[in-house]
Amino acid sequence: MKLLEIGNWMMVVCAGFYLAWWRITFRPPAPEGTPLGNICIILALISGILGIILAVAGMNGTSGEPVRAGFPGLGIVAGGAVSYVLLLVLSSMALHRQVTSELLIIIGWTVLELCALNHWFQNGRLAQWVAVLMAVIVILAAIASLVCYMLYYRVSYELGYLIGSVPLVLTAVVMILINLAVIAARI
């Protein structure tokens, strides 16, 4: 269980480095690669991969049976996969949005957080109302991030720079709230 918490904190670190990279590299008037920006994106990648590995290991490494019934984890993952394919088709073919890795990142983050919340609920770490509230917040953050994703190429470069920061800030804040809820549940 501790691995899941550490993994989720590593995802906050990842969002922080990703935001730093974005702010450094895409600062108006034009994108410019820098050594500091390169370091930030490498650290985001490392902390993100480590966070995912630890979170998944934490969810898979729990001993004993869950104390409460939740959603099947594979159902959440399958829902995420279907959502990704539908959004990929909708955004690229119907709305003519250039496909970038951010769509996969948004959906992947949403699935990871919903699985983590489900796991903490099933194992008695979060009350049902807290898990549901946090899940609603995750879904709202994902929707807001998807709106930003869709708007990015339709606005000026300067506005796109700001809009591109929103999902990174939102996800970091949401993960911090979730992590604090898990800590508070222990007290």
Name every feature range the model reports, one short phrase each.
Residues 1-69:
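N-terminal topogenic module of multi-pass integral membrane proteins
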Residues 149-172:
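Interfacial loop-to-transmembrane junctions
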Residues 8, 29-45, 69-74, 95-106, ...:
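Membrane-interfacial loop-to-transmembrane alpha-helix junctions, especially the N-terminal start
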